[in-house]
């Protein structure tokens, strides 16, 4: 591990950043590690597009001649992104309270990119621009993301902290490269197996309706993972078989078909009420119906599920159906876990707004596969640094004023601003180690600071 004072980035490494960053040093060679420190601090301080050129300007290295070494960190340097993901995951696990389960949300996101050299790109449905009546498609890269749901002391809402992000190349690009195409569910199954090897204990996976797949559910059960997702009303659900004594032949593997739509209109059904944690931190009273059944499709062994039918609180749409592969899980808790999944959507938006996801312009295959996972991981890294800061002194928004009180609720933009403030104070305004006088800022430091203040957000 090297933290040489002569390195441009090290002068801005605060004690809180060092406490988190030092753990990753073993995964890099010494030259790469020195460059990583510069890029890390520059990316945190940078506003707007996160490009190597922008990062170097922020760090006062606009006139450096061997700038290509910083580009090679992403495009050529030898380091393992999965090893970094494992270390980051281990750090995030330590943030969980003892009573909090290991709850991981999975989802895919589209990074809009164009260009002939972007080999893995494809044409996908753009969830942000599409509506229920109109589908909008965009060129781009599809990423599969795993995020740990963590409650944090400065916010009532739990945060989804990314730790594992994988590129899912399009079918056309795989065919052109002669590779077997993997769907989003294939990548998810692979990620489930990887995380289970890391944890070596049970955990919970939450995904939207796109992850309501029998193959994924079967994989989760084998890996001692509970899958929670939304189910279609026309899903093939069956009662448990009734075995008749003294009857010859193969035993039945399923009973009568269960039609969810018929259950919804059945007046004999007794609906229960429960209070759940709803979106926005509110409490909602819902009506729900729960039962255990079998999920079956030809060629796949039947899977026992806990089904929860929920009447929407606003009553504007038909009932929603949720399921859990753990049939012993409380139905209200299943809804609470699924509601927490929405935090992954918040993280996607905040990484675009504050960390420059979709603004990078790398075109080499290795750099593309590394840059977005690093930016997603930076979201968690900044949160870890802020958590260290909060342990010493409770964090408060720097935007607080006599006319504006955030009442203790901090967003990621607040956290990022506090970490930036800590870095800038250490870099430009901290006292000298040997003398009580303030360190004089060089022209390069002043120009870099003025550049940060003057550029558009």
Where in this protein do the model-derived segments appear?
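Active-site-proximal, Lys/Arg-enriched surface segment
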Residues: 76-166, 290-295
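Short, basic, glycine/proline-bearing loop/turn elements
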Residues: 73-78, 199-202
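Short gly/ser-rich anion-binding loops that grip negatively charged ligand groups
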Residues: 45, 60, 78, 99, ...
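Gly/serine-rich nucleotide phosphate-binding loop at the start of the catalytic core
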Residues: 9-75
């Amino acid at each position: 591990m090297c933290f040489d004072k002569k390195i441009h980035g090290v002068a801005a490494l605060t004690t809180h950043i060092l406490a988190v960053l030092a753990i990753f040093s073993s995964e890099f060679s010494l030259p790469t590690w020195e460059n990583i420190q510069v890029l890390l601090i520059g990316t945190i301080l940078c506003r707007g597009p996160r490009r190597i050129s922008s990062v170097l300007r922020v760090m006062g290295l606009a006139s450096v001649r061997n700038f290509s070494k910083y580009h090679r960190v992403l495009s050529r340097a030898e380091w393992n992104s999965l090893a970094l993901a494992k270390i980051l995951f281990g750090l995030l696990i330590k943030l969980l309270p003892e009573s909090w389960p290991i709850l991981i949300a999975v989802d895919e996101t589209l990074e809009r990119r164009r260009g002939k050299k972007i080999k893995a790109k494809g044409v996908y449905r753009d969830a942000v621009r599409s509506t229920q009546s109109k589908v909008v498609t965009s060129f781009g890269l599809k990423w599969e993301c795993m995020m740990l749901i963590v409650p944090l002391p400065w916010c009532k809402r739990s945060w989804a902290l990314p730790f594992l992000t994988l590129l899912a190349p399009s079918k056309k690009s795989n065919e052109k490269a002669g590779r077997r195409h993997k769907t989003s569910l294939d990548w998810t199954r692979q990620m489930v197996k990887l995380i289970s090897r890391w944890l070596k204990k049970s955990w919970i996976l939450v995904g939207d309706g796109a992850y309501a797949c029998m193959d994924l559910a079967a994989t989760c059960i084998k890996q001692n993972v509970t899958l929670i997702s939304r189910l279609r009303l026309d899903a093939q659900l069956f009662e448990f078989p009734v075995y008749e004594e003294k009857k010859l032949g193969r035993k039945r593997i399923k009973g009568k078909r269960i039609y969810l739509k018929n259950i919804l209109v059945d007046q004999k059904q007794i609906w229960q009420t429960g209070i759940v944690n709803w979106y926005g931190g509110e409490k909602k009273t819902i009506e729900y119906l729960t039962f255990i059944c079998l999920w079956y499709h030809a060629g796949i062994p039947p899977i026992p599920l806990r089904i929860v039918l929920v009447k929407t609180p606003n009553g504007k749409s038909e009932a929603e159906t949720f399921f859990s592969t753990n049939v012993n899980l409380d139905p209200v808790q299943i809804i609470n876990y699924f509601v927490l999944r929405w935090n992954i959507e918040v993280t996607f938006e905040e990484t675009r707004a504050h960390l420059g996801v979709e603004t990078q312009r790398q075109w080499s295959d290795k750099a593309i596969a590394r840059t977005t996972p690093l930016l997603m991981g930076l979201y968690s890294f900044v949160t870890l640094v802020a958590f260290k800061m909060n342990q010493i002194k409770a964090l408060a928004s720097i935007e607080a004023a006599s006319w504006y009180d955030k009442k203790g609720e901090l967003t990621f933009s607040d956290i990022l601003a506090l970490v930036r403030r800590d870095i800038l104070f250490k870099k430009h305004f901290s006292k000298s180690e040997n003398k009580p006088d303030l360190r004089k800022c060089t022209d390069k430091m002043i120009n870099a600071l003025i550049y940060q203040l003057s550029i558009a957000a």
